[in-house]
Amino acid sequence: MNECGGTDIRLFAKIENRRGMDALAELLPHADEIVIARGDLGNAVPLWELPAVQKRIAARCRENGTPFMVVTQMLASMEHSRVPTRAEMSDIFNAVLDGAASVMVTGETAAGEYPADVIRYLALAAHAAETFLKENGI
């Protein structure tokens, strides 16, 4: 982007299918952040493989020093429930432990009944993970 004169613009590359996974090495030097789009990826790979795919992409991003974002169904139950599931809290915690620079919610705040609670729980889980990392010297 610098060579185009747009130094204030951040570029995000969304990985949403096998083609994106295959192109990751090419994208890493050029993207400011990689978006691990689990909803789309979950349609491209068997669901039981999705966690490993997420971990592999995260590892490649860390190796390259490229920030990454984890998105899709972080707190999906909260579209209609005031309290998240334990699995959702663990998911956010683990995304932060894996080095995510960002976690993003979509439907939870766009169409959900408790958008402020969603952000509160998202922040609580992310903060707990950051605290865990600091306390354990990770």
What feature does the model see in each segment?
Residues V35, M104-V105:
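Conserved beta-strand positions in the central sheet of alpha/beta enzyme cores
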Residues G137-I138:
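Short coil/turn segments at secondary-structure boundaries
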Residues M1-T72, M78-D98, A110:
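Conserved alpha/beta-domain cores
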Residues V53, E108-K134:
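C-terminal helical cap(s) of enzyme catalytic domains, especially alpha/beta-barrels
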